[in-house]
Amino acid sequence: MTTNIHDQRILILDFGSQYTQLVARRIREIGVYCELWSWDVEESDIRDFNPDGIILSGGPESVTEENSPRAPQYVFDSGVPVFGVCYGMQTMAEQLGGKVATSTEREFGYAAVQVTGESALFKDLEATQDVWMSHGDKVVEIPSDFVKIAETETCPYAAMANEEKKYYGVQFHPEVTHTKNGMKMLENFVLNVCGCEGLWTSASIIEDAVARIKEQVGDDEVILGLSGGVDSSVVAMLAHRAIGDKLTCVFVDNGLLRLNEADQVMEMFGNKFGLNIVHVNAEQRFLDALEGESDPETKRKIIGHVFVDIFDEESKKLKNAKWLAQGTIYPDVIESAASKTGKAHVIKSHHNVGGLPDDMEMGLVEPLRELFKDEVRKIGLELGLPYNMLYRHPFPGPGLGVRVLGEIKKEYCDLLRRADAIFIEELHNADLYNKVSQAFTVFLPVRSVGVMGDGRKYDWVVSLRAVETIDFMTAHWAHLPYDFLGKVSNRIINEVNGISRVVYDISGKPPATIEWE
């Protein structure tokens, strides 16, 4: 019998913290299903969701300001355990009779917290804990039925608890890795206080997804746009496991892929895994549509429109295809809901976030829409996809279309593909590939004088780009060894006829973006 992986669940109310999705990912890592909703959710929605516990996230607002966000009163009337983090602790204190004040000393960074009392939250943890603080306000008076369970030198109430009602608040962020035992605190809350078990595993997620796809589509056929990226690849494997040859994958080679990528996709999914794939070689069609266009945003739109047109044409050839499978993941759903309503809300509503035509008369199959990217990768491994494919660096949707600056020509793409392949190969050879978050090569539409043998040449310039980042919102340029960069440069100039100069991009984000276009 299939495990009901949604049987136990945690609700996270989002007050706007940059770390809120990280809280959700941590709960999933513990093995428990959770959803992320906006703080101003309706009481009826919480009641219908029936959570085993509620977490109130951090946020940028001040509890002391008029009209700042508050948790719905039902959170405290529902009888379920509640865990307030940073702003979540402050609003809990304020709403239950305590006091919050703006602090003269803003605490940001590492802090040593002294545990001052026994609590289920700090079970099996030592008296001093290294934590990550990020707050201006602080609780100066806790509600009368709470006790202090931790403090710092500058924060008298670093944590508070009402053990009887199972309410807990911490002024720090247990979800970030900087809080050394933060994961243990979250485990104590989710597993011990809320009584959840670890039902949410890669194997059980796959089992659930396969059963749902079978139930949803019955004997109908399904079509999927397979790009070779992580999300569509995992959807392909799940759907194939569920319905076999009733799945048709459409792989569009737009001429903007990495070196040999089209062959690799066909070899892996067609030959190795035996999926039914329609391979559309549309390089010339994309190049014709892009001819003369140099504006980055317009290039993106053209690439998107041509892909949609081709996919539409191919889907019409499959008369029995009633369903469209998409690689929508949970952050897409949250972002899509937030952009439409101003708030992240329930996962069940269907947003077509893939940009495919609205007049496509097909049902949507989205087996990943509850999953974060790290979860998608883990189930990909479980399904037999290679590690190197699942954990390779991000590649933009428009591909080389935004890595060839200015107008796109086949000559430029071919040169860039070969130069980029050398850079990536050398990163692997030097054991540096997994030490940077993203690395790639950019083609610059400018010529530079070079010397080859006794002759001069006047050829193109490429830039190498490598960054280190945690969340891709900000990034540092990677300080790769000079000897390594020299080796890559020499190989590119000697092996790629048409490139005379290699430069290295040392811009951080901000002010620069990671991609050049």
Swiss-Prot record:
Keywords in alphabetical order, please: ATP-binding, Glutamine amidotransferase, GMP biosynthesis, Ligase, Nucleotide-binding, Purine biosynthesis
Q: Which reaction(s) does its UniProt entry say it catalyses?
A: XMP + L-glutamine + ATP + H2O = GMP + L-glutamate + AMP + diphosphate + 2 H(+)
* Entries under SUPFAM superfamilies matching the protein: Adenine nucleotide alpha hydrolases-like, Class I glutamine amidotransferase-like, GMP synthetase C-terminal dimerisation domain
Q: Where is the active site?
A: 86, 173, 175
Q: Which domain of life is it from?
A: Bacteria
InterPro entries per the record? Class_I_gatase-like, GATASE, GMP_synth_C, GMP_synth_GATase, GMP_synthase, GMPS_ATP_PPase_dom, NAD/GMP_synthase, Rossmann-like_a/b/a_fold
Q: How does it assemble?
A: Homodimer.
Q: Which protein is depicted?
A: GMP synthase [glutamine-hydrolyzing]
